[in-house]
Amino acid sequence: MTNFEPKKLKKNWTIEDSISTYEIDKWGDKYFSINSKGNISVTKDINSEKKIDLFKLVRELKSREINTPLIIRFNDILKDRINALHDAFLKAIKTYKYKNIYQGVFPVKCNQQKNVLEKIIEFGSPWNFGLEVGSKSELLIGLALLENQNSLLICNGYKDKKYIEIATLARKLGKNPIIVIEQKDEVNRIIEAVQDLNASPLIGIRAKLSSKSSGRWSKSVGDNSKFGLSIPEIMSTIKELKEANLINEMRLLHFHIGSQISDIAVIKDALQEASQIYVELFKLGAPMKYIDVGGGLGIDFDGTKTSSNTSTNYSLQNYANDVIATIKDSCELNNIEHPTIISESGRAIISHCSVLIFNVLGTSHVSSKLKIYDDKKQSLIISNLIETFYELKKLKNKKINLSQIIELWNDAKKFKEDCLVAFRLGFLSLAERAYAEELTWACAKEIANNLNNDEINHPDLFEITETLASTYYANLSIFKSIPDCWAINQIFPIMPIHRHLEEPFCKGNFADLTCDSDGKLNSFINNGKIKSLLNLHEPEQDKDYLIGIFMTGAYQEALGNLHNLFGNTNVVHIDINQNDSYKVKNIIKEDSKSEILQLLDYSSASLVESIRINTEAAIDQKKLTIEEARKLIDQIEISLRKSSYLSE
């Protein structure tokens, strides 16, 4: 019997090794680190020494019957992100002697959760922080939550007459809605609403910029972009507003060049074009007051500070400086007052505060044991594989001859393929085919155990690592909790939240609970590149192995779906105290199976009754005892009240 054990790389694994492996010092933005116990720590804000132990927090939440998978939102990090955004603009305003203010709004579409929006409004109140809405439903949220009469409510999206009427009348409540014209036909609807209501709204225009964008959302600009008015349409809109005596309500220019802009040069070009449009609108007689630079402020998911899709080649301060300086230059060249600057920086505000935690249910990998059979009657193909295996064993502890190893590996693959052909033709039994596959894995493990990382990553050998990798079964639905991983191949930082004093000598990826081959996490950050396998620990018997997915606060909950009927996870809002302790502020309980089924018009009572009728028939036919029927119904009723995830 031959045993193949995972290859340990270091004798004394340190926290520094874990930091290097998972690059937490690069993407963590000082909010996340590893403590002396080998657990992830979460910091109150980037200037604070106050931290809490994330692993300890999750265990204590479990003792409260708040199980994984769960989302933990750190209110202090959310507050710090809002403060950091305003501090950056305040510094830029002071540096460039800008003669107006920055007044941000949060795009509700990034995270519509009530507790989140209430905190954003609370934390942003010193700066009259407002909201941006893109539908009538979001408009109603904004009108209900925004009580500060100095806060702005930017009204974007498609607008029918009712949308416009609601926003217009809300102005009489002391609210500050600005209706942004994004489609040309909205002009007539605004004019009709004004005539019907005898009330006027504040008006803005979204410009369809010609400046090129970058990244996944580059089509947000250009002639074929979904929203915005072309320059000729802007000119005709100004003419129509003048004819309707509404030009004095025209106050804002808005543009948006896409989400998660990675290259600061793209932002600069757009700012220059938009600033000049703002100047021209002023010259055309509009009493302009605001310029809304939209979203696009990116965050550094992979920590490389580059212009890749998962990073940014600029800092928050760089961004604020360029916004302030560019708009100032355009206005001063034309003797125009500096406008109030608005941004819709959703991802940069909300991403860092949310961490998704899940537990590993189990693992699968190729067999680690092999018994070599020396049978003279066995197939020649099998004999060839055995001979290849022994040739590889002879190379153990000898000077590595990489070309020879590659040749032997190619031989092993060819012999395995020959076995498959023979099996299809009926010349090889199922047992022989299984033996051939085990021998091929054995060859792969011999090679892996004899080579270092650089050697095993040779293009002709890299598939060995993939072959030997473990699949870690994750107690979550990717489609529900991190849909961007599936939909657009978004990369989030992923790592264990504990055991960082131990070497993670296994390599693996994650499979979720859904019956879908797309339900896999197999793309991980790797010094600016993407790797398909993550260093992981061997799960311990009867102990949770907990994994964190970081920076998930934007869009994921709104976009998540009910694939295979996995519902909302537990959500917990945490305040970090000054004494390294915490306070649980809010708990939003996970969906039960009954609640999920109700969304699809299934009555739990009807389902149970239908099954009960079946059990009665089975009892009559002597297929089921009364005791078995009762037990089945009891289990179903209990299950309906429980989570859709595996926490029972």
From Swiss-Prot:
Q: Which Pfam families match?
A: Arg_decarb_HB, Arg_decarbox_C, Orn_Arg_deC_N
CDD domains, alphabetized: PLPDE_III_ADC (cd06830)
InterPro entries referenced in this protein's UniProt entry, alphabetically: Ala_racemase/Decarboxylase_C, Arg_decarb_HB, Arg_decarbox_C, Arg_decrbxlase, De-COase2_CS, De-COase2_N, De-COase2_pyr-phos_BS, Orn/DAP/Arg_de-COase
What UniProt keywords are attached to this protein's entry?
Decarboxylase, Lyase, Magnesium, Metal-binding, Polyamine biosynthesis, Pyridoxal phosphate, Spermidine biosynthesis
PTM N6-(pyridoxal phosphate)lysine: at which residues?
K109
* Keyword Metal-binding attached: yes
Any idea of its EC number? 4.1.1.19
Q: Return one Gene Ontology term, BP aspect.
A: spermidine biosynthetic process
The organism sits in which domain of life?
Bacteria
> Do you know which SUPFAM superfamilies this protein is assigned to?
Alanine racemase C-terminal domain-like, PLP-binding barrel
Q: Which cofactor does it need?
A: Mg(2+); pyridoxal 5'-phosphate
Residue sites binding substrate per the record: I291, D292, V293, G294, G295, G296, L297, G298, I299, D300, F301
Q: Which Gene3D superfamilies match?
A: 1.20.58.930, Alanine racemase, Lyase, Ornithine Decarboxylase, Chain A, domain 1
| Disulphide-bonded residues | none
The record's catalysed reaction(s) read:
L-arginine + H(+) = agmatine + CO2
Q: Part of which pathway? A: Amine and polyamine biosynthesis; agmatine biosynthesis; agmatine from L-arginine: step 1/1
Supply one GO molecular-function term: arginine decarboxylase activity
The reply to whether Metal-binding figures as a keyword in the UniProt entry is yes
Family membership, please give it: Belongs to the Orn/Lys/Arg decarboxylase class-II family. SpeA subfamily.
> By its UniProt entry, which HAMAP family does this protein fall under?
SpeA
Q: Give a short account of what the protein does.
A: Catalyzes the biosynthesis of agmatine from arginine.
What's the name of the protein?
Biosynthetic arginine decarboxylase
Origin organism is Prochlorococcus marinus (strain MIT 9215)
- Gene that encodes the chain: speA
